[in-house]
Amino acid sequence: MQVYAVGGAVRDQLLGKPSQDRDYVVVGATPADMEAAGFKPVGKDFPVFLHPHTKAEYALARTERKTAVGYKGFAFYTGADVTLEEDLVRRDLTINAMAQAVDEHDNLVGPVIDPYGGQKDLAARKFRHVSDAFAEDPVRILRVARFAARFHEFTVAPETVALMRKIVDAGEVDALVPERVWQELSRGLMEAKPSRMFDVLRECGALAHLLPELDRLWGVPQRPEYHPEVDTGVHVMMVIDYAASVGASLPVRFAAMAHDLGKGTTPEDMLPRHIGHEQRGVKLLEAICQRLRVPNDCRELALVVAREHGNIHRSTEFGAAALTRLVERCDALRKPERFAEALLACEADARGRLGFADKDYPQADRLLAARDAAASVDAGAIAKACGDKVDQIKDRVHKARVAAVAQRLGMAEE
């Protein structure tokens, strides 16, 4: 029985990066051998075992073959006769198909076992598939795209791009379950340069299948006086990357991705203006969230940003009444943290333009001040003062909030 660290741990050590992955493969063992050594079996589809002390997962070396469409359509074989090279050949990329022995202290020891040229591709900053078996699992397209967002200086080998296109053309991407698509997209959004993920998905044609609402933004013009980058798709990528550069949360990054979807449906005779794109975008966003089963925190923030980002940008022109209505529509009094994240997404939108990355965004501080002023109003006391006239409560509370905002910001109520 020999234990190896495989994949990310070896790759990241060679790159001089802290490892986010720790996967182990055991060669020359049977399930009975593992249990006899104190490991606990947990795998459903193939033998995976928990270490008796660290609880880390150890998988028996295995081979696999395709049996059906989709990422679950595989049959596996594990046995003491499966070699390390046979296990590594089923992996996605050469840079992930390397192994190294581990000692009793979990240190990587001995030579790097690299039968498929992973070290060469690391040096060349290249993503290359190990074998044509790559085509058997469509999730690998998403994984390559996600790796591109993490290792954004890497490029995809031309032959790998061609193979990814074949997978897309064969309809394999359409068979992916929504939860797995969202899992990979959300991971990619949280990497250092999320735009690279979408670049790769566009290059192989997968984005048009997975997120057609986003894919159609490329080539859609915007007014150059507001958007020197002109292309809407380019703008959205700049917005996502800005959000990533300030360490924004997943909901903010998703909102950044989805804020301008409505521009993809602007009538041609209206271009490069996009009147009403916010409302059109909300409908498209709802469809994406339902299709991919997007978590509620991401969905709710993205909807607020898609609907209100234009008003938030223009809010420096608003009086106290309009500011208060905007704060109320955003539900900022009940959900102040979400409101702050909406403002961050809008700041990313404003700065995600050519030449605007360092521009001030006074709208955020102004709206936060308006929110705080509106929140200072004692709605309970107003309700009590209204007595039986309950139909007046909402209007009186709103007027009190407007007055508080006007006083805080030193402006007229209208």
UniProtKB/Swiss-Prot annotation:
InterPro entries the UniProt entry points to: CCA_bact, HD/PDEase_dom, HD_domain, NT_sf, PolA_pol_head_dom, PolyA_RNA-bd, tRNA_CCA-adding_enzyme
EC number: 2.7.7.72, 3.1.3.-, 3.1.4.-
A Pfam entry, by short name: PolyA_pol
Source taxon at top rank: Bacteria
One Gene Ontology biological process: tRNA 3'-terminal CCA addition
Positions that bind CTP: G8, R11, R91, R143, R146
Binding sites annotated in the UniProt record for Mg(2+): D21, D23
Ranges where the HD domain occurs: 232-333
Gene Ontology terms, MF aspect: ATP binding; CCA tRNA nucleotidyltransferase activity; cyclic-nucleotide phosphodiesterase activity; magnesium ion binding; phosphatase activity; tRNA binding
Binding positions for ATP per the UniProt entry: G8, R11, R91, R143, R146
Cofactor: Mg(2+); Ni(2+)
UniProt-listed Gene3D superfamilies: Beta Polymerase, domain 2 (3.30.460.10), cca-adding enzyme, domain 2 (1.10.3090.10)
Protein keywords: ATP-binding, Hydrolase, Magnesium, Metal-binding, Multifunctional enzyme, Nickel, Nucleotide-binding, Nucleotidyltransferase, RNA repair, RNA-binding, Transferase, tRNA processing
Cofactor note as given: Magnesium is required for nucleotidyltransferase activity. Nickel for phosphatase activity.
Reaction catalyzed: a tRNA precursor + 2 CTP + ATP = a tRNA with a 3' CCA end + 3 diphosphate; a tRNA with a 3' CCA end + 2 CTP + ATP = a tRNA with a 3' CCACCA end + 3 diphosphate
Reported function: Catalyzes the addition and repair of the essential 3'-terminal CCA sequence in tRNAs without using a nucleic acid template. Adds these three nucleotides in the order of C, C, and A to the tRNA nucleotide-73, using CTP and ATP as substrates and producing inorganic pyrophosphate. tRNA 3'-terminal CCA addition is required both for tRNA processing and repair. Also involved in tRNA surveillance by mediating tandem CCA addition to generate a CCACCA at the 3' terminus of unstable tRNAs. While stable tRNAs receive only 3'-terminal CCA, unstable tRNAs are marked with CCACCA and rapidly degraded.
Family, similarity comment: Belongs to the tRNA nucleotidyltransferase/poly(A) polymerase family. Bacterial CCA-adding enzyme type 1 subfamily.
Further details from the record: A single active site specifically recognizes both ATP and CTP and is responsible for their addition.
Assembly description: Monomer. Can also form homodimers and oligomers.
Free-text note regarding domains: Comprises two domains: an N-terminal domain containing the nucleotidyltransferase activity and a C-terminal HD domain associated with both phosphodiesterase and phosphatase activities.
Name of the protein: Multifunctional CCA protein
Organism, scientific name: Cupriavidus metallidurans (strain ATCC 43123 / DSM 2839 / NBRC 102507 / CH34) (Ralstonia metallidurans)
Lineage: Bacteria, Pseudomonadati, Pseudomonadota, Betaproteobacteria, Burkholderiales
